[in-house]
Amino acid sequence: MARWEPLLEQVMRERAPRLLAYAAMLTGDDTEAHDVLQDALVRSFSRGRRFDHVNQAEAYVRRAIPSVVIDRSRKFRPVPRDPADHPHVAAPASDRDAVMDVRTALRELSPRERACIVLRFYDDLTVSQIADHLGLADGTVKRYLSDASARLAALLGADVDLREENTVPVTAPLAKGRR
């Protein structure tokens, strides 16, 4: 057995549910989340990287997930031609006014907008950290966050306010050495 295999097994046994939930938040689809997690694991463990601890391996896989989501979105996907295939366009006004849950609303964003929103409000990263993480300019990240916030506010209702001063992190600070 290769040196990395026990660590991969430990990541899958202990950390997979958390990583899968994170991938599902970014993809909006449980099946695609499984594929994204698998791709992120392959990227993380196939390049001969040496991880000293399961926390380090999990952090690397977690960091790879948004990149995998964006890369997968670049692949060809058929574009529906029938307006009925666009529920956000073809739905009657009463349906559009119904409250949507956050996961459904996130699906309406582009992959990059979704990644920026999740990294900002779920992972509590700063704009510059998101830019470094995704390989984008700070201004580009700000634009994605602005566009996505406006879209989410429209989808979730007028009383949703994603301005910085009105948000709180959804994750508690981790104790040193734990992740």
Where are these regions (language model features)?
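A short, charge-rich alpha-helical start-of-domain segment used by transcription regulators
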Residues: M1-A21, T31
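Acidic, proline/glycine-rich intrinsically disordered inter-domain spacer in sigma factors
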Residues: P6, Q10, P78-V79, P83-R107
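Short, small-hydrophobic-rich alpha-helical interface motif
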Residues: L19, A23, A33-S44, I130, ...
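Helix-turn-helix DNA-binding motif, specifically the short coil turn and the N-cap/start of the second
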Residues: D29, S110, T126, G135-T140
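Structural recognition of an alpha-helix C-terminal capping motif at a helix-to-coil junction
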Residues: D35-V42, S46, N55-S67
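Arg/Lys-rich amphipathic alpha helix in sigma70-family domain 2
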Residues: S46, D52, R63-A84, D95
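DNA-recognition helix of helix-turn-helix
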Residues: P66, I70, L134-L162, V170
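A short pre-motif secondary-structure segment
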Residues: C116-R120
